């Protein structure tokens, strides 16, 4: 966690994923079919990353991502790259409202550890090499809590004598991975996390085992904070609390109230929170989430990335003003509610509409914070 003056998250910021161009989707299909080589696919990938980085810089973003073009899933590709984690067919779609996903999943195949050859390191090095001076290369990875979910840790007893021993290894693997990103020159990392929205749904369900999910929340705080402990002081680490994002559909609904006490304990420099519609509830929980940490920024995701219609600037400004009853304006920032393509399928809007959404975020933020 940084100890210097707030920089990132910026007053206007990008969550991470961008719509995959047709050329990249085709290249992925050809690679899977064996009709092009990995080097040929990588050349197309780099060309498209260079293009979207230039577009982000042109828009005026102070931190840019590679659009997550080097991965198919926002979370699984990273998890598969850790030592002790393997890929398998779950034979079930993730339960999005109104659509079905591919059935890939991750599972423990050994003790979890940092992998010095994780493919995300090479992807970051390419991004870093093309980002101009004065702009940060932002790296997104899934939260360690994503290994708790969807049967991914079911066989932990094969490799560990206790659940706590597993959590300790998981935290260390993440800590070492984040440290290596920093050693490669990364100063801005974001941990994306749907677990909190999952817990919102469970803790609001009168038939759910609340004691079990409360323990889950406590473990999540423990692992995340252990992963963040003793990292360099000039490294910014944020999180994005996601409710699911697949072809413009979602997984979870509910206000942040039931998880706010836990979110307030997390030692992040900033939290990106989805607030694009009534499913997210109101701003009442912001006071607990921010937890009166003058160093921390709450990034309000008031602009949807799921649909092309542009929000009205006046409405966005009114909502930011409403949030100041819980968090000072100096500790707030603005973004889209999520990325545009958490999986390579992408949301139901065009690339031009995607850039228009980001331009709206930037323009509105500059009106709210003239110094932005």
Name every feature range the model reports, one short phrase each.
Residues 1-372:
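Domain-level signal for soluble alpha/beta catalytic cores
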């Amino acid at each position: 966690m940084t100890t210097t003056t707030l920089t990132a998250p910026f007053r206007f910021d990008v969550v991470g994923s961008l719509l995959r161009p047709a050329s990249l989707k085709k290249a992925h299909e050809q690679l899977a079919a064996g009709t092009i080589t990995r080097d040929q696919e990588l050349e197309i990938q780099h060309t498209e990353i260079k293009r979207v980085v230039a577009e982000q810089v042109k828009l005026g973003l102070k931190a840019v991502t590679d659009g997550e073009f080097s991965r198919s899933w926002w979370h699984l590709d990273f998890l598969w790259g850790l030592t002790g984690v393997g890929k398998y067919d779950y034979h079930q779609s993730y339960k999005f409202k109104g659509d079905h996903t591919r059935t890939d999943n991750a599972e423990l195949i050994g003790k979890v550890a940092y992998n010095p050859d994780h493919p995300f390191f090479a992807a970051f090095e390419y991004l870093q090499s093309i980002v101009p001076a004065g702009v940060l290369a932002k790296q997104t990875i899934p939260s360690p809590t994503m290994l708790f979910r969807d049967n991914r840790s079911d066989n932990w007893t094969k490799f560990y004598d206790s659940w706590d021993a597993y959590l300790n290894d998981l935290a260390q693997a993440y800590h070492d991975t984040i440290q290596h990103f920093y050693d490669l020159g990364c100063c801005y990392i974001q941990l994306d996390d749907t677990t909190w929205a999952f817990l919102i749904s469970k803790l609001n369900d009168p038939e759910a085992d609340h004691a079990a999910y409360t323990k889950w929340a406590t473990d999540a705080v423990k692992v995340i904070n252990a992963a963040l402990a003793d990292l360099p002081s000039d490294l910014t680490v944020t999180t994005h609390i996601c409710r699911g994002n697949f072809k413009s559909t979602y997984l979870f609904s509910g206000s942040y109230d039931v998880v706010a006490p836990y979110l307030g304990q997390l030692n992040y420099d900033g939290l990106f929170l989805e607030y694009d519609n009534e499913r997210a509830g109101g701003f009442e929980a912001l006071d607990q989430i921010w937890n009166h940490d003058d160093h921390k920024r709450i990034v309000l995701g008031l602009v949807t990335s799921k649909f092309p219609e542009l929000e009205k600037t006046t409405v966005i400004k009114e909502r930011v003003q409403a949030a100041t009853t819980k968090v000072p304006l100096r500790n707030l920032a603005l973004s889209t509610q999520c990325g545009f393509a958490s999986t390579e399928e992408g949301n139901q809007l065009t690339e031009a509409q995607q850039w228009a959404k980001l331009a709206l975020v930037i323009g509105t933020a500059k009106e709210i914070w003239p110094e932005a």
